[in-house]
Amino acid sequence: MLMAKSTKRITEISSIIANTVQIRPWQESDRPFLRTLYLHARREAWPWLNGAEWQLEDFDEATRDEVIWVAVQNGHRVGFASVWTNDNFLHNLFVDPQYQSLGVGHLLLEQVQKTFTSTGALKCLVRNERAIAFYQRHGWHIEATGD
């Protein structure tokens, strides 16, 4: 597990719409999709972990009391991010594998960073090299590593 912090300042944008992707606050009607995305995206991102016992309902516990942003493209939900705002902590950021590397994660991260009142933080599994590279490309740096 590594801890990362953002050093990159973000630019205010008047609209969170780019390349037909809109970032909006979550709605209860998003829950079924986000549960499914959370389950399947974790299994794909962390194949070395035993995801057999993970359940759709894990999303509910993992995002309890967090601010959730949903990425929507042409009416289809394609990703989400959740933040524990008290600590400026990015807890989850997952994009449907079909929409990865298309800028969706960038837009979600940009929105999350706009909500931070100070330096943001996150944890990322050390073996999740793709995610680490993503955050580093966006100005985050590793503060510490551990189990």
Model-assigned labels for residue ranges:
Residues 96-102, 126-127:
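Active-site acidic-Proline motif in GNAT/NAT acetyltransferases
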Residues 136-145:
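Conserved acetyl-CoA-binding loop of GNAT-fold acetyltransferases
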Residues 101-114, 133, 137:
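Conserved acetyl-CoA-binding loop-helix of GNAT-fold acetyltransferases
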Residues 1-29:
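Conserved N-terminal entry element of GNAT/NAT acetyltransferase domains
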Residues 16, 25-98, 109-111, 115:
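Acetyl-CoA-dependent GNAT
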Residues 115-127:
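Conserved GNAT acetyl-CoA-binding A-motif
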